[in-house]
Amino acid sequence: MEDRIQKAVELFKSGYNCSQSVVAAFADMYGFTQEQALRMSASFGGGIGRMRETCGAACGMFLVAGLETGATEATDREGKAANYALVQELAEEFKKRNGSMICAELLGLKKPEGSSVPEARTEQYYAKRPCAKMVEEAAQIWVEYLEKQMI
């Protein structure tokens, strides 16, 4: 499972957004191709469409949680409740480790950037942003959840 954490970080460092990196690292476990994973998670990067709201890495973790435990019947209240409880547990762990799950807060931004254009991925970009760490944390939290399920 450690290789999945590393894969998520490598995907991010190769240019994929935070959400894509987390989802694509686990997609094959749920029967999705890498292309499908990248497409389904593309909009969540940058705190959802670069709006700096909920961290994209956390969103990716939640998307994978839905693939693992999401209800598939409209009337499955117990299934929905179990999935929501898991998402809340994952969110609490993410916040505990990182102080927040709001992208702008994690980046230390005082106001939204106001652009939909992502920054170029340079050494300076990686040096000033905690995003690779957020991707690693989200993947780590998910791996820890999966490992607990195997016990």
What name fits each language-model region?
Residues 25-43, 112-116:
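Acidic-glycine-rich active-site phosphate/pyrophosphate-binding loop
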Residues 16, 44-63:
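Glycine/serine-rich anion-binding loops at beta->alpha junctions
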Residues 1-14:
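Polybasic, low-complexity association/targeting segments
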Residues 83-151:
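C-terminal binding/interaction regions
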